[in-house]
């Protein structure tokens, strides 16, 4: 039994046999290749030498794939830091939009269309209800993030929305509801359900949907109509978490949700010739952690379910936080509220400086003597050094 193994190790052992027996999309195949070859030299190397002692360092490049567990931390820190300048010292709420599990097969067969429909339904629900004078009567700002997994890597598409708890009315006056969320959850539920189902029906009527695997029965009109009736009869359950405790907690929370993938390396507990054991939360037991063992190929199947379609944008900004509005309107909100501007810490810093600040590691210093390291020209031919020469 292998302990201290990584997702890369799991892919090396089980992906080749999985690929030979399963249908895999180009995006999934590309993600698998990137994960297996990240930091192996397949994506090139950076070679540097110490000016003082001559010690040579070879750094293998990462794949930078958004599904790779080894490539998320640095982009996450940069993205979250850039969002500092958009954050107000005002109430924020975390709203989660989910759909009935009966829709999962048809969503998985039509990811690009039906993931996009999730954004449309969630954003239209929040914007339209917030603009209604019965609730707040303002233009609000929020960020929507798509996650497609549950704790066991099951298929569970849902939207996380980080919502500003106030906004600007038609006269550009600030309005909020204090620490209480300004929209009733039941109203959100009914509105979101209506909007998502309307777009799903429109896609079906326009013959835009595909029906693969367990979604095949829904190609029949009567079976599809029965699915719609089942989903309409259900109570869709979005939920709102308690407000954030200040702007810094919003920034930390964004880091928790934005660049997450289906499972991280620390949750992989062990691997055998045939199985993988990982930890997951058991929500039937108040979210307590438990260990789950599944076959290696089943692990690969579950992981690849969460590779997004090519060029699909998972993080989207709306209202006051949209790229069209935020420069003027967030500045206006900040002036009205009299709150300070949170300045980006990493703006205009190069990679070595960011690494030094975040991880207290100076990659420009030799690990042997502390001397200055310089990079060798990329076009220079380089002979692989002997092991004793490597730092």
Task: Please describe what each predicted stretch is.
Residues 1-391:
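Beta->alpha loop/short-helix hinge microenvironment recognizer with preference
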């Amino acid at each position: 039994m292998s302990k201290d193994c990584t997702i890369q190790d799991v892919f090396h052992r089980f992906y080749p046999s999985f690929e030979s027996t399963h249908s895999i999309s180009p995006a999934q195949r590309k993600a698998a290749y990137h994960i297996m070859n990240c930091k192996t030299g397949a994506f090139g190397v950076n070679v540097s030498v110490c000016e003082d002692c001559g010690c040579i360092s070879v750094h293998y490049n990462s794949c930078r794939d958004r599904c790779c567990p080894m490539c998320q931390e640095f982009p996450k820190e940069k993205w979250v830091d850039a969002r500092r300048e958009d954050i107000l010292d005002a109430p924020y709420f975390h709203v989660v939009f989910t759909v009935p599990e009966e829709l999962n097969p048809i969503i998985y067969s039509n990811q690009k269309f039906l993931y996009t429909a999730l954004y449309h339904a969630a954003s239209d629900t929040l914007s339209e209800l917030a603009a209604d004078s019965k609730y707040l009567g303002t233009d609000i700002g929020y960020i929507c993030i798509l996650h497609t997994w549950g704790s066991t890597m099951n298929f569970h598409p849902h939207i996380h929305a980080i919502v500003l708890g106030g906004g600007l009315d038609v006269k550009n006056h600030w309005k909020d509801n204090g620490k209480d969320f300004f929209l009733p959850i039941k109203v959100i539920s009914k509105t979101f359900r209506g909007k998502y189902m309307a777009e799903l029906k429109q896609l079906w009527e326009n013959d835009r949907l595909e029906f693969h695997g367990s979604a095949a029965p829904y190609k029949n009109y009567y079976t599809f109509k029965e699915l719609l009736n089942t989903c309409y009869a259900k109570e869709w359950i979005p939920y709102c978490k308690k407000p954030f405790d200040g702007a810094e907690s919003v920034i930390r929370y964004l880091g928790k949700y934005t660049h997450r993938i289906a499972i991280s390396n620390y949750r992989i507990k062990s691997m055998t010739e045939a199985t993988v054991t990982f930890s997951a939360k058991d929500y039937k037991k108040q979210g307590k952690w438990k260990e789950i063992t599944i076959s290696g190929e089943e692990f690969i199947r579950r992981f690849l379910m969460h590779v997004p379609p090519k060029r699909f944008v998972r993080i989207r900004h709306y209202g006051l936080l949209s790229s069209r509005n935020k420069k003027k309107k967030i500045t206006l909100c900040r002036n009205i509220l009299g709150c300070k501007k949170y300045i980006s810490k990493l703006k205009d810093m190069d990679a070595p400086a960011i690494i030094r600040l975040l991880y207290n590691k100076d990659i420009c210093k030799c690990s042997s003597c502390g001397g200055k390291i310089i990079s060798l020209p990329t076009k220079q031919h380089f002979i692989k050094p002997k092991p004793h020469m490597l730092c």
